UniProtKB/Swiss-Prot annotation:
The gene is fbiC. In the N-terminal section; belongs to the radical SAM superfamily. CofG family. It comes from the Bacteria. Its cofactor is [4Fe-4S] cluster. Pathway: Cofactor biosynthesis; coenzyme F0 biosynthesis. Pfam families: CofH_C, Radical_SAM. It catalyses: 5-amino-6-(D-ribitylamino)uracil + L-tyrosine + S-adenosyl-L-methionine = 5-amino-5-(4-hydroxybenzyl)-6-(D-ribitylimino)-5,6-dihydrouracil + 2-iminoacetate + 5'-deoxyadenosine + L-methionine + H(+); 5-amino-5-(4-hydroxybenzyl)-6-(D-ribitylimino)-5,6-dihydrouracil + S-adenosyl-L-methionine = 7,8-didemethyl-8-hydroxy-5-deazariboflavin + 5'-deoxyadenosine + L-methionine + NH4(+) + H(+). This is FO synthase.
Length: 865
């Protein structure tokens, strides 16, 4: 018992106490700095009296070690902010919440469904005048889904959703006041987080608890609240990590969870941070019962229980993750005990606005908070909404479009807030619409003569301060092991039965039958390949087709973190490059002179690329060569462009089509199974987003290819599932022109070098995958393309005799596979492609991008435009 501390009620879920020996052992392990397991964490949550004091000392030592390592020993941080309650409407019904209200009450109070823009700016300006640097936007989850009044309010002002409005007012605050938005809009999808990242320094959402029963059981605090499903909340936190968003989360203490559930919640957050390094702070918030709520009679969390939870959180998270407790939910004297328990951050404290979530608990005066902090032997220092290490790291954590805003308010050395800096509005805008060529622009040639300058991008491993570009490799290897456990077994009898069924109706098999074909080997595989070859002959004849084209990769600067990719580089790396629009147009003209009918343009996800950049590239090519077919931009690039432009996928694609885009590549698909996908990539779009982009493209009149990359951590069951998805899309839209098989090139791939992937597909895998594609896609997608870049001449010929009918293109340049270690060159002449087909006695025919016939034109004399 600490002198002067208010004794609160006992915990609402009385646990069975651990044995004294279990407590002694757990405390000893905490003192020794040993990693604690779940059982030990639960034991320590019971600590009281001398045991609690011992526990807190261990937690404080871990906290102090982290501060020392971060270069700011003896400091407690806080953010001077304003609280902007954008809307108090919500579709959830949490039993402890007084923040949320209903439309009738708002009308009775003379208030709108949302704050108007001028109301938002008034709050922000008052904060800016007092030196606040953070605009904390808090609001209910998707109120338009529950309340017609909210939907009407948004519609009348031209917004499709609450998140659209939040984006708009965030830009307004940046431009008019310079305050840095921290967004708390609740559960969001990957695409929604991506769309808001350019307007926010950080985001957050309390996990609250992983106790599913509090969501599923009637009468529990989260029952009837769709956004409080722990699985949904964890997915949103994961997506923020994939997108490198500095993210705040935390737990609520005393809302009906058991101590085991509480420990599980903390460990779930730890797992998230280990994988992505994005948890910038963890809030441990004690439940306070409020009048006019369903939980008004529930007891508050006991203070000793609260202290023990903070200490255990610190021990589980380690020295590098800030632990925060709100100073307004305890007495001033109790604040001292929170520091003793291991916190190193007070969170946002406002000199302007109340805590709208806990309006009955005013913020402490900042001078008082400083005195309390100093009484514990610490110095109170100001930060911005993103914690210092993310500010110092910059890209990909801080979007370039708010880079100037962040730089104006932060110290570049410490990453903390600049002393006495007053925010000033700055334009929120895209980079200049024109850009210059930079870096190793001759890589398209040099990759075949000189090779790479470096073997890995510079941000592959950034040390303890910030997790590297690919996330945590131990976590990834664990995911790969889980995938391996579920790999299917092969049974010869199943293969033969499936083969007989496929001969009768190739497109009508069950998934189990297709899986049997995909696992075939030996004589059975020969029979499957022979069937695929016969289906090819029946469908498209014996012609082997190709397109005369040029690949133009306009930049390899990318921060997405695809673990299979050796192409992506960080800006400033020795192999990084960007091509100007003029250079791209020049290359398109050169391709035209050499007989090309198509240019295929794809690039890395460079956050500094202008939002108009994609359309600018298309227009540049069309101005130079009006007849050139522009096949460009993967679904990942399209999502990136639409998100940054604040537009829908459909509107963005329509604008690109109007600029001259003809078709899009169906790349970035990899494997359309998120279990595999999240091993392959840290930040690329999820399967659902890929499907949305492709189906939307088809609907607006842009046809596409389809692809599958295989031979890494996948197994044949994933191929079947992937092809099943493509069949469904083709049945719906009819927009696929071809299916392209992309064997994984492993030599320089980070995933392989980390020991987490196979060394590419085997010959059996290649034959089975090509044959399976022909059989499963029969009657839906006629053209099956094989890759000479990845398989070489001999391998390509084998695939042409097992279901494939197309060679792809002449390419003229190819850097993606070559940087990954492919040894089969980056260009083929028409004669060389013809030789591949003639070597197996097949005729060859040039085609267009969409598989039309080509009428040869006379060679040009002068460039157009």
């Amino acid at each position: 018992m600490i002198e002067g501390v208010t004794e609160l009620a006992t915990p609402n879920v009385p646990p069975a106490p651990p044995s004294p020996s279990a407590m002694r052992r757990a405390l000893r392990r905490a003192r020794d700095g040993v990693s604690l397991n779940l059982d030990e964490a639960v034991v320590l949550l019971h600590a009281r009296g001398d045991d609690l004091a011992d526990l807190c000392r261990s937690a404080a030592r871990v906290r102090d070690a982290g501060l020392e390592s971060a270069g700011r020993p003896g400091t407690i941080t806080y953010s001077r902010n304003v609280f902007i309650p954008l809307t108090r409407l919500c579709r959830d019904r949490c039993h402890y919440c007084t923040f949320v209200t209903v439309p009738g009450k708002l009308r009775a109070e003379g208030k709108g469904m949302f704050l108007e823009p001028d109301e938002v700016l008034d709050i922000a300006r008052r904060g800016a005048a007092l030196g606040c640097k953070e605009a904390l936007f808090t609001l209910g989850d998707r109120p338009e889904d529950r309340w017609p009044e909210a939907a009407q309010w948004l519609d009348e002002r031209g917004y499709d959703s609450t998140l659209d409005y939040l984006r708009a007012v965030s830009i307004l605050v940046l431009e008019e006041t310079g305050l840095l938005p921290h967004l708390n809009p609740g559960v969001m999808s990957w695409a929604e987080i991506a769309r808001l990242k350019p307007v926010a320094q950080s985001m957050g959402m309390m996990l609250e608890t992983t106790a599913t029963r509090l969501f599923t059981e009637k009468g529990q605090c989260h029952h009837g609240s769709p956004d409080k499903d722990p699985a949904v909340r964890l997915r949103a936190i994961t997506d923020a990590g994939r997108l490198s968003v500095p993210y705040t989360t935390g737990i609520l203490v005393g809302i009906g969870e058991t101590l085991t559930e509480r420990a599980e919640s903390i460990m779930a957050i730890r797992k998230q941070h280990k994988a992505f390094g994005h948890i910038q702070e963890v809030i441990v918030q004690n439940f306070r019962a409020k009048d006019d709520t369903a939980m008004r009679d529930a007891p508050d969390a006991g203070f000793d229980e609260f202290r023990a939870t903070i200490a255990v959180t610190r021990l589980l998270l380690g020295p590098d993750v800030p632990v925060q407790a709100p100073p307004n939910l305890v007495s001033q004297q109790e604040c001292l005990a929170l520091i003793e328990a291991g916190i190193d951050d007070w969170g946002g404290v406002s000199p302007v606005t109340p805590d709208h979530v806990n309006p009955e608990r005013p913020w402490p005066n900042l001078d008082t908070l400083r005195e309390l902090t100093e009484a514990s032997g610490f110095t109170l220092v100001e930060r911005t909404s993103a914690h210092p290490k993310y500010v110092r790291a910059g890209n990909p954590w801080i979007d370039p479009r708010i880079g100037a805003h962040v730089a104006a308010l932060t110290d570049p050395v410490t990453g903390l807030a600049k002393a006495d800096a007053l925010p000033v509005g700055l334009p929120w805008q895209e980079p200049d619409e024109s850009w210059e060529s930079a870096g190793r622009t001759d890589l398209n040639i040099a990759i075949d003569t000189e090779g790479r300058n470096t073997e890995a991008r510079s941000d592959a491993a950034l040390g303890q301060d910030v997790v590297g570009a690919f996330g945590d490799w131990d976590t990834i290897r664990e995911q790969v092991r889980d995938l391996a456990v579920n790999a299917p077994e092969r049974l010869d009898s199943d293969v033969l039965a499936a083969l007989r069924a496929a001969e009768r109706d190739p497109a009508g098999l069950s998934d189990d039958q297709y899986l049997a074909l995909a696992t075939a080997d030996g004589a059975e595989l020969d029979a499957v390949a022979a069937l695929a070859d016969q289906l090819r002959r029946d469908t498209v004849g014996d012609d082997v087709t190709y397109v005369v084209n040029r690949n133009i990769n306009f930049t390899n600067i990318c921060y997405t973190g695809c673990r299979f990719c050796a192409f992506a580089q960080r800006k400033g790396d020795a192999d990084a490059f960007t091509l100007s629009t003029e250079e791209v147009a020049d290359r398109a003209w050169e391709a035209y002179v050499d007989g090309a009918t198509e240019v295929c343009m794809q690039g890395g996800i460079d956050p500094d690329l202008p939002v108009t950049g994609y359309a600018d590239l298309v227009r540049a090519v069309k101005r130079r060569v009006p007849s050139m077919h522009v096949h460009a931009f993967s679904p990942m690039e399209i999502v990136n462009g639409a998100s940054r432009g604040g537009e829908s996928i459909a509107d963005w694609l329509t604008a690109l089509k109007e600029a001259g885009l003809d078709t899009i590549p169906g790349t970035a698909a990899e494997i359309l199974d998120d279990e595999v996908r999240w091993v392959l990539t840290k930040g690329k779009l999820p399967s659902s987003a890929w499907i949305e982009v492709i189906t939307t493209a088809h609907r607006v009149g842009l046809r596409s290819s389809s692809t599958m990359m295989y031979g890494h951590v996948d197994n044949p069951s994933h191929w079947v599932g992937h092809l099943r998805v493509l069949r469904g899309i083709q049945d719906e839209t009819g927009g696929f022109t071809e299916f392209v098989l992309l064997p994984f090139v492993h030599q320089s791939a980070p995933l392989y070098l980390a020991g987490a992937a196979r060394p590419g597909p085997t010959i059996r895998d290649n034959r089975a995958a090509h044959a399976l594609a022909r059989i499963m896609l029969h009657g839906r997608i006629d053209n099956i393309q094989t890759s000479w870049v990845k398989l070489g001449i001999a391998g390509t010929r084998v695939m042409l005799q097992g279901g494939a009918n197309d060679l792809g293109g002449t390419l003229m340049e190819e850097t993606i596979s070559r940087m990954a270690g492919s040894q089969h060159g980056s260009a083929k002449t028409v004669a060389e492609l013809a030789e591949i087909a003639e070597g197996i006695g097949r005729p060859v025919r040039e085609r267009t991008t969409v598989y039309g016939r080509v009428d040869r034109r006379p060679a040009p004399i002068v460039p157009v435009g």
